[in-house]
Swiss-Prot record:
Cofactor(s) needed by this chain: a divalent metal cation
Major enzyme class: hydrolase
Coarse class of the protein's main subcellular location: cytoplasm
Sites where the protein binds a divalent metal cation: 8-9, 40, 93
Function: Nucleotidase that shows phosphatase activity on nucleoside 5'-monophosphates.
Sorted UniProt keywords: Cytoplasm, Hydrolase, Metal-binding, Nucleotide-binding
Protein's recorded name: 5'-nucleotidase SurE
Keyword rRNA processing: no
Length: 253
């Protein structure tokens, strides 16, 4: 099995190294095509107004000055064009990609692009807690990653479907199994703008998230990782809402 690995945190990210090790536990034919720099939050964007710069890092490792979607296209359509990958793995992201995160995530977009190109694709992310970005339990994704991927592949991924996997913020032995769950939704009142002033008196802004208690919905990715379970969520490329389609057809047709 030929595996193409990408991410959105960049070619030097620790999570990419973790995913390479996971991939090599599944196959000895692993190729890495990842962004030259951190592309977190770029979602499914493409570089349409700038050229893609390709740098060979090692025999089967490449860096692209572009987005995760650019990287997957470069891998499938150029680097591996003679024989394409059988599987695209995107991650392991530093931080969870659950609920509405999936609409912003470059990690999920890497798997989405693989799916568009007809390749089975899985996005993987490692949640972290109060300790912050400097205290990510990569060992949890490392320990459970290969087995989780194998089980997903054995179950089968249908065309047009990608799989989003989130590992909880706990030690590997504390994981309470796999939960196949729906995409959740947070309280968007927690999203805010943090206004600050620079040394010259000019205002600047950061996106911020307020600290507040929030009860995640039952059967969601948010609830699963809160309960120390590995959240596995199948996502569709087709964003059509069928009930509304039917209702609008009756109301507007």
């Amino acid at each position: 099995m030929r595996i193409l690995v990408t991410n959105d945190d960049g070619i030097h990210a620790p999570g990419l190294k973790v995913l390479e090790e996971i991939a090599r536990g599944l196959s000895d034919d692993v190729w890495v095509v990842a962004p030259e720099t951190d592309q977190s939050g770029v979602s499914h964007s493409l570089s349409l107004n700038d050229p893609l710069r390709l740098r060979k890092v090692a025999e089967t490792r490449f860096a692209v000055k572009g987005t995760p979607s650019d990287c997957v296209i470069m891998g499938v359509r150029h680097i591996l064009k003679e024989r394409g990958p059988d599987l695209v793995l995107s991650g392991v992201n530093r931080g969870q990609n659950v609920a509405e995160d999936v609409t912003y995530s470059g990690t999920v977009a890497g798997a989405m692009e693989g799916t568009i190109l007809g390749v089975r694709s899985i996005a993987l992310s490692q949640a972290y807690g109060a300790g912050g970005r400097a205290h990510v339990k990569w060992q949890t994704a490392s320990h459970h990653g290969a087995r989780t991927i194998r089980r997903i592949l054995e179950a089968g991924i249908e065309p047009g479907i990608l799989v989003n996997v989130n590992f909880p913020d706990c030690e590997p032995e504390a994981v309470e199994g796999i939960a196949v769950v729906a995409q959740g939704m947070r309280n968007q009142q927690l999203l805010a703008i943090d206004e600050r002033v620079d040394g010259r008196g000019n205002p600047y802004f950061w996106l911020a998230f307020a600290k507040a208690r929030f009860e995640p919905g039952h059967g969601t990715d948010l609830k699963a990782i809160a309960e120390n379970r590995i959240a596995v969520t199948p996502l569709r490329l087709d964003l059509t809402d069928e009930p509304t389609l039917t209702r609008f057809a009756q109301a507007l047709g």
